[in-house]
Amino acid sequence: MGKYNLILSEYLSFIYNSQSAVQIPIYYSSNSELESRCIEFHSKCLENSKNGLSLKKLFIEYNDVIENATLLSILSYSYDKYNAVERKLVKYARGKPLEADLTVNELDYENNKITSELFPTAGEYTDSLMDPAILTSLSSNLNAVMFWLERHENDTAEKLKIYKRRLDLFTIVASTVNKYGVPRHNAKYRYEYDVMKDKPYYLVTWANSSIEMLMSVFSHEDYLIARELIVLSYSNRSTLAKLVSSPMSILVALVDINGTFITNEELELEFSNKYVRAIVPDQTFDELKQMLNNMRKAGLVDIPKMIQDWLTDCSIEKFPLMAKIYSWSFHVGFRKQKMLDAALDQLKTEYTEDVDDEMYREYTMLIRDEVIKMLEEPVKHDDHLLQDSELAGLLSMSSASNGESRQLKFGRKTIFSTKKNMHVMDDMANGRYTPGIIPPVNVDRPIPLGRRDVPGRRTRIIFILPYEYFIAQHAVVEKMLIYAKHTREYAEFYSQSNQLLSYGDVTRFLSNNAMVLYTDVSQWDSSQHNTQPFRKGIIMGLDILANMTNDARVIQTLNLYKQTQINLMDSYVQIPDGNVIKKIQYGAVASGEKQTKAANSIANLALIKTVLSRISNKYSFATKIIRVDGDDNYAVLQFNTEVTKQMVQDVSNDVRETYARMNAKVKALVSTVGIEIAKRYIAGGKIFFRAGINLLNNEKRGQSTQWDQAAVLYSNYIVNRLRGFETDREFIMTKIMQMTSVAITGSLRLFPSERVLTTNSTFKVFDSEDFIIEYGTTDDEVYIQRAFMSLSGQRSGIADEIAASTTFKNYVSKLSEQLLFSKNNIVSRGIALTEKAKLNSYAPISLEKRRAQISALLTMLQKPVTFKSSKITINDILRDIKPFFTISEAHLPIQYQKFMPTLPENVQYIIQCIGSRTYQIEDDGSKSAISRLISKYSVYKPSIEELYKVISLHENEIQLYLISLGIPKIDADTYVGSKIYSQDKYRILESYVYNLLSINYGCYQLFDFNSPDLEKLIRIPFKGKIPAVTFILHLYAKLEVINYAIKNGSWISLFCNYPKSEMIKLWKKMWNITPLRSPYTNANFFQD
């Protein structure tokens, strides 16, 4: 337990190393006698430090506290405002500072010039192109590195090598930063003009990325990659990541498959010892050589050499180094361009008339037919979702920006806001709400833009459309997605699958007479050529669908949808350029519509089908699979003869030629053994994921707190680690210390202990052991959890005032009236709460809640409230179960081959013993009969929490609940009187518990929980028919066994003798479990 607390204490003495600095530990205990000693200890410490006395005697006198109580937090005093960073940095700044080459980047502002050269005056300055957008500072990052270096300067052997590598890299960063001085951040963690004017513009974001990279160096190869990227990314802010990661699309085609996993009929991964040779035409090698030459031209030396060396034998054993380079390239940080350049990028493409009209016609028709296929059933049956599409849209309206700031009145309060949900309420109150009229987005009302920044690609623009577009599209898109959910071609949406399933699908059909064609169509999605055929295909489909029904409301829904497409064919955008706002006619498709993902998938499927139908005129093959996944599509083609180099070359050139006939600037490749798409890549029959999540730079600023960001940082670290990019854990923990500390006054700071940050309470930030989610069951853990729960629900005056206004109340009751057929408090309260929660995205409200949260936390961290919350958490349930289990040693042999080489050893071991799973465990209740019954008659979608509440009510209350949602009385009666209802009780409880235990997150999502190998380690005699209890006992046992194996690399077996008398008690408790939302769970959710 003590690792974090130990580092915390060392970190504090490192930061506050002056005479005046004091650290006062604060302890607590659930034992009341010990607790009073804790309080005594704390007050004496305060007393002594006020009088400047040493605390050493107290530590001896109160040894019982230190030994037996739990550390709650550390209070630290320091009177010198520290310019400590600068002082410490000098020690490391012994190298030659980097000089930026100011000619590397095409766009002037992407060169790392001194800020005042890019922005001559403060008025012209913007930090938007280099804002790290994270609530931690460069000085903190430097401190964290220097702390690590100081801690490890006496390391020996292998550890010493790591120390030297990192020291060497840090010398580069320190020397460069020191040359200009450490940029000081303001209260919002932004870097202002007067701080930056005499410094290179990209200094901060470069230094953050460099620190992230150097703290991820372990081996010599890591060191070479990092050094090269750190040095070159100082100058090259535009193309470096792209150059370094480009070769991967070809590398995956070079490795022979010798044994792989394939998907079998049951959709499970099954080992196949097939051998498939990589057939690579010379042309491919020429393209690869060209890529390596481009890298060398950009000044890269070691990285192209590593790739070159690997090419001698192209072995899968050494491939992880290629995967490593590919992942590392993303850690140079985000490429952030000016909005004008991002928008013009798509408009620069030459528009030619010289295209194959026949292909375009086929493409449009395929889109039309797919739209019809997706919507035919719901339209013919006058689906209620299409009838009440407006209500459905309002219920799921987001609280994102509506594109303009308006003055809104809520009761006596007048506020300015851009939020969609607030605009809808305001419009309704003032009779301006007209969902039947889709506002134009032409030259008179150009679309405001958002942005999407990503490493290694150009900035993309996002439409911020008026909320009418969302309402018009929502219901129809939901129906499209339901269709996509049971259509395997749509890899991204396919029901409950995960990426392992898609992996097995590809490898399944690879053989000596097959080839796989994979295309990155991101350029096509945003090209002007796509927009007319794309929108027209959708419009034609909608026209045909409108003739399949006589229901006026369904026709109206389809017509409004059609109108959004017509309007967007003539779209203008507004782009701020300096102080002017430019209006530009924008003839391409941009994200921002509700339909973006669904429609792009349809279009990409149509595109690859069009291309394949052309190719099939010339070759004879069977298409074994076609898949589309976001911006990528791929297909496996089976020929009747063995594939030769010449064939691969010919097919490849014909495919490219075919795309060119449509003027589609896409990257199309053909291989016999592997593919590379944005989400994953397959090489040598194994699956890899890009570990490219940036830790110390963020894409954009949201309204998350430092605590939230600390949790996201940890969560990102875990995802990277599972994907093969490991950052030093001590460094991550140091960052968490910095980001979770709370300032009381200028010289007084409070640092929460590991117990506070890892107990699953509303404040949880990380796990004390990577990959293992612990649910504390000791007295002290449960005590602190209870104490935190008593602090829940921070109020916001502004939110309460808005919620009390007639505008808000009328809106909520309007929704309830339209939705409900009779009174239903659960649903009405739910809607009101959801709407109130949406207000959180309005900054003043989230600020107010944050302040309340922090002051509550401060009280708490100095002395836990003795208030006992009576709520039951999952911890209580597990605590009741634990005593009845007995542990014995066990042995499981490794029986599966590795197929995900980047996994950490301990996680890999578990998969090799018990196997993996290719599906997501259902944790939202959507498969239950009651959920299906509701969606059959109503547009309302109850959450798993609500279903869990409802299903445990009395039968007549469940009937009333159903009837109020418009379910016919006969169906409600049948449901409650049937067996299905009791099955549902069990099913929903199961889903709810899975949800609470985060079974689909972290590394748990990789394990097969129903593995017979795992089952045989668990023995629970069957007593009485309470399936829910049996379920929780088994699940607890499985988690215990797996957690033990992750931690110790060996297996245990569990025997449980659960008394029958306790079962009913436990069962009753299980219907009152309170869910806990924390920064940690939000971060998990955010990964999704």
Swiss-Prot record:
MF terms (GO), sorted A to Z: nucleotide binding; RNA binding; RNA-directed RNA polymerase activity
Enzyme class: transferase
Cofactor: Mg(2+)
Pfam families to which the protein is assigned, alphabetical: RdRP_4 (PF02123), Rotavirus_VP1 (PF12289)
EC number annotated for this UniProt entry: 2.7.7.48
Subcellular location: Virion
GO terms classed as biological process: DNA-templated transcription; viral genome replication
Gene3D superfamilies reported for this sequence: 1.10.357.80, 1.20.120.1390, 3.30.230.140, 3.30.70.2480, Viral RNA-directed RNA polymerase, 4-helical domain
Endpoints of the signal sequence: none
The keyword Glycoprotein is assigned to this record: no
Superkingdom of the source species: Viruses
RdRp catalytic domain segment(s): 501-687
Protein purpose: RNA-directed RNA polymerase that is involved in both transcription and genome replication. Together with VP3 capping enzyme, forms an enzyme complex positioned near the channels situated at each of the five-fold vertices of the core. Following infection, the outermost layer of the virus is lost, leaving a double-layered particle (DLP) made up of the core and VP6 shell. VP1 then catalyzes the transcription of fully conservative plus-strand genomic RNAs that are extruded through the DLP's channels into the cytoplasm where they function as mRNAs for translation of viral proteins.
Subunit structure: Interacts with VP3 (Potential). Interacts with VP2; this interaction activates VP1. Interacts with NSP5; this interaction is probably necessary for the formation of functional virus factories. Interacts with NSP2; this interaction is weak.
Family in the record: Belongs to the reoviridae RNA-directed RNA polymerase family.
Name of the protein in question: RNA-directed RNA polymerase
Organism name: Rotavirus A (strain RVA/Human/Indonesia/69M/1980/G8P4[10])
